[in-house]
């Protein structure tokens, strides 16, 4: 089974070897999610309303993803750093501490979701019409909480061991299954939006089974339940995992918060049609960002492993490659968004009324998108090098202290209406992205230079 050697070979090849399988997997996963929404949007008579209803479920789905990232993104870099140091025992304990916390959190989240689904959806801006479709979709989706979290949260530990192809396959299995099952459950079995949720849950179960099969039976370091006599040691590791993972967790959680705020303001200023517009914009953003996340996640284990091995030259090279690849890709996609927004929106809906409102909203939302790259690059470096404070601070800064206040101030304070909601994003990209990137340069480079001089 081919494995990436993060300490040897060219840095660019290491990153590409890790990033390309992730890119394939994430594109398939994106295609799966997009197909889900495309089919839902084309359900006869209720498509646009049903699409908006799914968008109302996004905050809860984001919260589940946030907890997956708390343990996956928090544990995998520390896992890689310890592998770089040659400390396999600590790496093993970190992975299994993350697994135990992940499973416990999944049970709690599923229970809370079942108990409070209806009031939460109402809080998120669901009208009575939208609630008819959002509630059953969410109740079925919640059944897949544990497999969803295992598939998402434990996959980074596969990639961190250098098995990028296996990581890709675990995502691919679920994505392909969802693409096949969606039309069967939605149209052939005439289950509508409930069918879309059932197809999603089945696909998540398949992905989780493959992840668990590999980590439990085939990988060098195997996933297992922690023993009673390991609890005290695992408590210390749990604090480290949660501390580092809080950055990604906060980013996902604040995405959910922003989604709630946007839906509430859009519901008041534009009605249900603008919630559907935001759902499409979120889908386009997910599509555009997929390769960026693949590059970031492909670079992360290279950064972490070589930082643990005290190879600052390779850490610097990985950072430069990350910056170049992300900025070139985003420059191309940014141009496509501004030149041909109708094409991107048309992928998700053919509703002419929706298209009329969505085109200017999309252009406004992505007006300064390239600055968002600076945030992603900085966050990836901070997380990979176990810089907890910086990672957490910049996760909070952009979303909580810039986007959320602007989402209310621009529409109501400056009377910009729905445009104000979409304008909040580019303003936050410029401010938050620039500050994060500059801070990374002035704090990380001196440390790496010092590490190099001490070798």
Regions found by a protein language model. Name each.
Residues 1-19, 79-144, 188-245, 303-368, ...:
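Short alpha-helical transmembrane segments in multi-pass integral membrane proteins
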Residues 6-38, 42-46, 59-74, 78, ...:
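N-terminal transmembrane alpha-helices
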Residues 69-72, 141-159, 167-178, 196-211, ...:
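Short runs within selected transmembrane alpha-helices of multi-pass transporters and secretion channels
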Residues 27, 31-52, 121-128, 184-191, ...:
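Helix-terminus/linker motif at the lipid-water interface of multi-pass membrane proteins
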Residues 17-36, 140, 174, 203-207, ...:
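Transmembrane helical elements of multi-pass membrane transporters/channels
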Residues 22, 26, 38, 77, ...:
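Transmembrane alpha-helix boundary and packing residues in multipass membrane permease domains
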Residues 51-111, 148-167, 263, 275-335, ...:
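Small-residue-rich hydrophobic transmembrane alpha-helices
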Residues 48-59, 134, 138, 197, ...:
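Small-residue hotspots at the loop-to-helix junctions and early N-terminal turns
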């Amino acid at each position: 089974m081919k494995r990436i050697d993060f300490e040897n070979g060219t840095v660019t090849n290491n990153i590409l070897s890790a990033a390309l399988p992730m890119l394939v997997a994430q594109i398939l996963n994106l295609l799966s999610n997009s197909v889900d929404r495309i089919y839902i949007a084309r359900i006869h008579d209720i498509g646009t309303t049903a699409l908006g209803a799914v968008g109302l479920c996004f905050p809860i789905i984001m919260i589940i993803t946030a907890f997956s990232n708390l343990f996956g993104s928090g544990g995998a870099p520390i896992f890689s750093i310890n592998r770089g140091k040659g400390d396999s025992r600590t790496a093993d304990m970190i992975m299994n501490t993350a697994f135990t916390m992940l499973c416990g959190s999944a049970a709690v989240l599923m229970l809370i979701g079942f108990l409070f689904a209806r009031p939460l959806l109402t809080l998120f801006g669901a009208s009575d019409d939208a609630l008819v479709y959002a509630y059953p979709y969410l109740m079925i989706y919640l059944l897949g909480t544990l497999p969803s979290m295992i598939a998402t949260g434990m996959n980074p530990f596969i990639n961190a061991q250098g098995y990028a192809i296996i990581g890709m396959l675990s995502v691919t299995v679920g994505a392909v299954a969802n693409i096949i099952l969606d039309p069967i459950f939605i149209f052939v079995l005439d289950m509508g939006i409930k069918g879309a949720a059932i197809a999603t849950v089945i696909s998540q179960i398949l992905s989780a089974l493959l992840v668990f099969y590999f980590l439990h039976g085939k990988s060098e370091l195997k996933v297992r339940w922690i023993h009673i006599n390991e609890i005290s040691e695992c408590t210390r590791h749990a604090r480290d995992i949660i501390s580092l993972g809080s950055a990604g967790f906060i980013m996902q959680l604040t995405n959910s918060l922003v989604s709630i705020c946007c839906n509430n303001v859009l519901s008041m200023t534009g009605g249900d049609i603008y919630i559907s517009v935001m759902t499409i914009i979120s889908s386009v953003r997910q599509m555009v960002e997929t390769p960026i996340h693949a590059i970031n996640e492909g670079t992360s284990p290279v950064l972490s492993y070589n930082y643990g091995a005290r190879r600052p030259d390779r850490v610097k090279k990985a950072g430069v490659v990350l910056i170049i690849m992300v900025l070139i890709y985003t420059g191309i996609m940014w141009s496509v968004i501004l030149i041909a927004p109708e094409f991107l929106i048309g992928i998700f809906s053919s509703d002419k009324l929706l298209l009329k409102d969505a085109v200017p909203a999309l252009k406004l939302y992505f007006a300064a998108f390239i600055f968002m790259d600076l945030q992603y690059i900085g966050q990836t470096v901070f997380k990979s090098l176990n810089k907890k404070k910086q990672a957490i601070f910049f996760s909070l800064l952009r979303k909580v202290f810039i986007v959320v206040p602007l989402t209310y101030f621009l529409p109501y304070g400056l009377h910009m209406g729905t445009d104000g909601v979409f304008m909040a994003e580019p303003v936050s990209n410029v401010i938050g992205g620039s500050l994060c990137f500059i801070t990374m340069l002035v704090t990380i480079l001196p440390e790496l230079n010092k590490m190099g001089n001490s070798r």
